[in-house]
């Protein structure tokens, strides 16, 4: 099939590469978001998908308004049979959806109808789900609600961060997307409506959402931190410093008398109290510095910065 691939960040790369390598499909163009500021100097930089497409000599489309009449006409002129989407980053309107004869197929990183929205991996981890997955479905106007072509599942491991889990789903989802494209081309695959029950929403995670709430139980603090690692990154105030906090553990032999947010510094360990057990900090990143061992940070910190996290 003649395919246009729409995607932007790194998790979309395995899917694009699978379709490029496929002997059955021809990726005739890539649709991605416009160059965005990156690095300390904030210079505009192409998306990971744009870079991979350019490396393979595939035309790259970066419309600032993908639903504009001008871009709808530009896409129609390419005459794609189908458009595949992985984390493109913009909602598509009716006129654009009508361009390819076989529609638009999205790879979404959850088992729909669970966790529709922008942050399904983060939501699954924060909720304490034991299993998640990836789904291919036909895009409709309403958010992530279209009929489903296929699903793969993935067990969530106790130490998974969002980065870990998304990396595995990006790989397994790439195979699912290729198989879905094959089935659509063959006419052997039929999309099945999503069930009305079990719908949940996963909105985009903001920096404010990533602030650690030490008044929650330890196991909730643990999974909420992992759900925003590496991005946007969990953080807390320690004294007057805003520090990023890496994944924590909940040791059986940790102190039992700490109040939520109270910090206790040992020779080799730093514990912080929660609503239940204390958690053991692994790494922290103070402002303007690289990530470091929490105990090393505490030894060099001011006394007022290591009394309480909030």
Swiss-Prot record:
Annotated (6S)-5,6,7,8-tetrahydrofolate binding sites: 110-113
Keyword Transferase among UniProt keywords: yes
Source species: Mycolicibacterium gilvum (strain PYR-GCK) (Mycobacterium gilvum (strain PYR-GCK))
Name the record gives this protein: Methionyl-tRNA formyltransferase
The family this protein is said to belong to: Belongs to the Fmt family.
Gene: fmt
GO CC, alphabetical: cytosol
SUPFAM superfamilies, alphabetized: FMT C-terminal domain-like, Formyltransferase
Biased composition (Basic and acidic residues): 299-310
């Amino acid at each position: 099939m003649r395919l246009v691939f729409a995607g932007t960040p790194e998790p979309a790369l395995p899917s694009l590469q699978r379709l490029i390598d496929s002997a059955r499909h021809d990726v005739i163009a890539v649709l991605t978001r416009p160059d965005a500021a990156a690095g300390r100097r904030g210079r505009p930089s192409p998306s990971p998908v744009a870079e991979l497409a350019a490396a393979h000599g595939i035309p790259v489309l970066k419309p600032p308004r993908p639903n504009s009449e001008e871009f709808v006409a530009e896409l129609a002129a390419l005459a794609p049979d189908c458009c595949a989407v992985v984390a493109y980053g913009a909602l598509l309107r009716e006129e654009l959806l009508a361009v390819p004869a076989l529609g638009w197929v999205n790879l979404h990183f959850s088992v729909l109808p669970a966790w529709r929205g922008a942050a399904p991996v983060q939501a699954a981890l924060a909720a304490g789900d034991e299993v998640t997955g990836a789904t291919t479905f036909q895009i409709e106007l309403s958010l992530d609600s279209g009929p489903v072509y296929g699903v793969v599942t993935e067990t969530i491991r106790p130490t998974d961060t969002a980065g870990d889990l998304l990396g595995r789903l990006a790989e397994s989802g790439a195979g699912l997307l290729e198989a879905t494209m094959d089935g659509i081309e063959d006419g052997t695959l039929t999309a099945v409506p999503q069930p009305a029950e079990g719908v949940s929403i996963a909105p985009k995670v903001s920096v404010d959402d990533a602030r650690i709430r030490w008044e929650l139980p330890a196991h909730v603090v643990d999974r909420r931190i992992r759900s925003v690692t590496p991005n946007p990154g969990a953080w807390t105030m320690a004294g007057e410093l805003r520090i990023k906090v890496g994944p924590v553990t909940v040791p059986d032999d940790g102190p039992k008398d700490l109040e939520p947010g109270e910090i206790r510094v040992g020779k080799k360990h730093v514990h912080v109290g929660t609503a239940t057990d204390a958690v053991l900090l692994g790494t922290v990143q103070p402002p303007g510095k690289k990530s470091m061992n929490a105990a090393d940070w505490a030894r060099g910190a001011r006394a007022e910065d290591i009394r309480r996290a909030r």
